[in-house]
Amino acid sequence: MRTAIQGGWVIGWQNSQHCVLDEGIVIYNGNTIEFVGFPGDSDCPKPDRTINASGKLISPGFINLHCIANFDLQILNIDHPRSEGYNRPSWVIEPNAKTIMDDDDFRISADFSVASLLKCGNTSFGAVTTGLTKFWDDADAEPYALAEASERLGARAWLSHLYQEACDYTDDNGTPRRIWDRSKAQTGLDKALNFIKYANQSGSERLNGFLFPYQTARCSDELLKETMHQSQSLGNIHVRSHFSQRIEEFKQHKAKTDKSMVEWLQSIGFLGGQVSLIHAKY
């Protein structure tokens, strides 16, 4: 059945750039777009049915490169002061500490988040999941839950098992602390590589894996170098990291070296065409 969506404003592609077609029309048949233009055009096919989208924007799917893929948790985080539950208690560093969400919680969160993304017009997204559920790396179920939800609901997803070398927590006196553990970071990196293998072998054209050392300030030079080595061994697979996001991070860096933060990354080989540095404010 040939269907017309009558705008509204249609975002089209003309002369190598996007353009806005006021009262434009989109004609599709099955999963094929047959025409984008104006209804009076002689090349406009006659539709079997018409969807009235007057007053609305008709656009190709948006690409959300830095998507907080935990809308359920993130809204709670924004609505409440950080002193009310944001800081991790000291038990998170205990052996075999469990995340605040179980596997079913992650699946429900993934369904809600991917559905919300699609509802807002985001058909492709690069996921960033909340730090509230993390210690040194993701819970095992989290990226797989997002992958399953994305495939079932029809979103194109770039996903990763996140990892880092430092875990922040608050001690019993309310003082912020940070504990480093290279072995836990390596475990997280190994799981990230396993997830990339899973994505590559899934047969899905919409599922992509990448490497995500969660924050450069919580990673040693050695971990960042190993990340780049693994990226190169996988054909320069995409790498991203939170970088130079807060003034405290910048001050801690300058206390150690006179190099700028970008110069530091350049000196350890953590720059390249496959790398995306998130924020990069200082």
Which positions does each model-derived feature cover?
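N-terminal metal-binding scaffold of metallo-dependent hydrolase/deaminase domains
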Residues: 1-45, 54-57
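A generic local structural motif
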Residues: 13, 38, 50, 112, ...
